């Protein structure tokens, strides 16, 4: 088992999954005055995989090893000088050594060919330093058996953006990175109005080109190579509840957590598939009282994780404890829809998404308000500024009134992670917001000795349906997989969920290979119009 605690010699200390869950519950209850009471509450939330903390928490909590319980970090801004660049590289290496993935914004580095004062040379540009980061990542294994992940972003107005867009088209280059372009509102307006776009650095314009030409380069790279992703950075900052005290320039490797410099990504997911009562019947539903209680416990567990976790860097600890940001999300979402008899992407699915996520949003914010009353608000809480910032004014009136009177423990509370590995751990429920990729498939598993083994796996809802209805009963119309859905089906679900998520969503929009380029470009424009914070697509091709 991936998350089993083992001795240095490889002998299992966790003998069973309940042992692992008990270890995690015990560790996360340590900050409580009545730790035994909360240990039992936390363990109950973890049983049957109802609440799934992120992998770093499951594997590291209670082991006393020098690892972080935060999955990912956005690192500090890279100074535009050699000593600062390699200090940033050192910080990245130390973070990855403890098991954290990292995000970096390379827009702060001067473009290739710019003069370097005092040395009589020209700058090699940000892409050359990304190669150095890539080499570093190749040599560092994260804690346990988890390889490091990295996200590199660059602003759409950086002079080297065209090279950035095409960087991974070179065989073998930057394979340890995910790449995304930070797209501004001004750029989207320039694309719409077909005006010129300046590429500049430090107030110097290096090139001007039609905005649509640059947009087409981004789109064609995605059409053929599935990268770079698009992040609507102005929308992210505009809707950030902390925009009164921070500016976001990057995201964690999967994109669900836009973060400020040294920001940390603490994740956990409610497994909706485990909460459906009377599955595959007309009475199928989620018990909203049970969901609310589970969310309340999960928020407390994640908040405690901030206090028990180690941090690779002091700056990361300071940032996390000053803002107490958490990212509570969902997994098993598509399975829950199937069990409720609802087709992913349908209007009924959109309505159910909003109903479930509104319940989760309310429960999470109320839990954090109650924690603030008990333990205090996050240190950088400014009542007037917080209540008027970002997405906070859109919350229900009773929540706003409660925050005004009692404060709030956590600055941000919700995020939708991809949850690939923990979903497999939880009996192969569907991942995050994603539709079921395939109801039965072969998974290639790398073993501890480096060998690979093929395993036949089936989706959770599919196996449950077969157990309840029999092997020969036809599947219902709700059994749709990613390949049978249109891009619009994906988009409406992402947009519906984003309304109730204060951070962001990791989501891939699967496209048919036959999709026309014009229709492909429309996906991104539609995502922007629907209020999404980012857009990532995958179109299968021979590359």
Regions found by a protein language model. Give the residues of each.
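Terminal amphipathic helices with adjacent charged low-complexity linkers/tails
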Residues: 166, 181-183, 187, 192, ...
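Active-site cavity-forming subdomains of large catalytic enzyme subunits
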Residues: 70-287, 311-315, 364, 368-371
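Flexible, glycine/charged-enriched surface loops at secondary-structure junctions
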Residues: 33-42, 101-104, 144-151, 229-232, ...
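Catalytic alpha/beta core of large soluble enzyme barrels
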Residues: 249, 255-258, 302-307, 389-393, ...
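Acidic/polar, glycine-rich intrinsically disordered N-terminal extensions of enzymes
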Residues: 1-69, 215-219, 525, 529, ...
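Core structural elements
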Residues: 1-2, 44-62, 156, 297-308, ...
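A structural-propensity feature for long, helix-poor, extended segments
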Residues: 111-150, 277-310, 366, 374, ...
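Internal maturation/activation junctions in enzymes
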Residues: 201-204, 294-317, 321, 342-419, ...
């Amino acid at each position: 088992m991936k998350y089993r605690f083992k001795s240095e010699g490889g002998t299992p200390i966790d003998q069973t999954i309940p042992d692992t869950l008990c270890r995690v519950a015990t560790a996360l209850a340590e900050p409580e005055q009545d730790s035994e009471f909360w240990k039992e509450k936390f363990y109950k939330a973890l049983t049957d995989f109802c609440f799934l903390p992120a992998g770093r928490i499951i594997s590291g909590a209670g082991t006393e090893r020098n690892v972080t319980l935060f999955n990912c970090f956005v690192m500090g801004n890279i100074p535009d000088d050699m000593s600062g660049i390699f200090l940033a590289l050192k910080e990245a290496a130390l973070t990855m050594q403890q098991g954290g993935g990292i995000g970096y914004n390379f827009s702060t580095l001067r473009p290739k060919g710019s003069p370097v004062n005092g040395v009589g040379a020209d700058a090699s540009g940000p892409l050359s330093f990304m190669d150095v980061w890539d080499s570093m990542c190749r040599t560092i294994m994260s804690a346990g058996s988890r390889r490091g992940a990295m996200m590199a972003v660059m602003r759409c107005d950086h002079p080297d953006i065209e090279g950035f867009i095409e960087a991974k088209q070179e065989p073998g280059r930057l394979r340890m990175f995910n790449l995304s372009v930070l797209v501004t509102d001004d750029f989207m307006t320039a694309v719409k109005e077909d005006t010129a776009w300046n590429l500049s650095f430090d107030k110097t314009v290096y090139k001007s080109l039609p905005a649509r030409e640059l947009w087409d380069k981004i789109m064609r790279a995605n059409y053929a190579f599935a990268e770079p992703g698009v992040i609507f950075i102005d929308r992210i900052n505009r809707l950030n509840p902390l925009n009164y005290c921070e500016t976001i320039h990057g995201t964690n490797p999967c994109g669900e957590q836009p973060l400020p410099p040294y920001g940390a990504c603490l994740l956990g997911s409610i497994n909706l598939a485990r909460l459906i009562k009377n599955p595959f019947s007309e009475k199928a539903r989620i018990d909203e009282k049970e969901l609310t209680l589970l969310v309340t416990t999960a928020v407390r567990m994640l908040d405690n994780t901030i206090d028990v976790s180690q941090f690779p860097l002091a700056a990361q600890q300071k940032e996390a404890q000053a803002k107490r940001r958490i990212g509570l999300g969902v997994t098993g979402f598509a399975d829950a829809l199937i069990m409720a008899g609802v087709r992913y992407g349908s209007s009924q699915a959109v309505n159910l998404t909003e109903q479930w996520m509104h319940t989760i949003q309310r429960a999470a914010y109320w839990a954090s308000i109650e924690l603030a009353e008990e333990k205090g608000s996050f240190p950088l809480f400014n009542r007037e500024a917080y209540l008027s910032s970002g997405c906070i004014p859109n919350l229900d009136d009773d929540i706003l009134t409660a925050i005004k009177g009692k404060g709030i423990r956590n600055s941000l509370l919700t995020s939708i992670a991809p949850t690939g590995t923990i979903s497999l751990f939880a009996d192969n429920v569907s991942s995050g917001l994603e539709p079921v990729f395939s109801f039965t498939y072969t998974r290639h598993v790398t073993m501890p000795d480096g060998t690979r083994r093929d395993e036949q796996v089936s989706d959770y809802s599919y196996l449950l349906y077969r157990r309840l209805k029999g092997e020969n009963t036809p599947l219902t119309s709700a059994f749709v997989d990613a390949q049978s859905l249109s891009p619009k089906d994906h988009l409406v679900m992402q947009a519906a969920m984003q309304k109730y998520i204060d951070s962001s969503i990791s989501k891939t929009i699967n496209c048919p290979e036959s999709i026309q380029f014009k229709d492909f470009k429309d996906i991104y424009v539609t995502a922007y119009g629907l209020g999404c914070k980012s857009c990532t697509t995958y179109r299968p091709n021979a590359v």
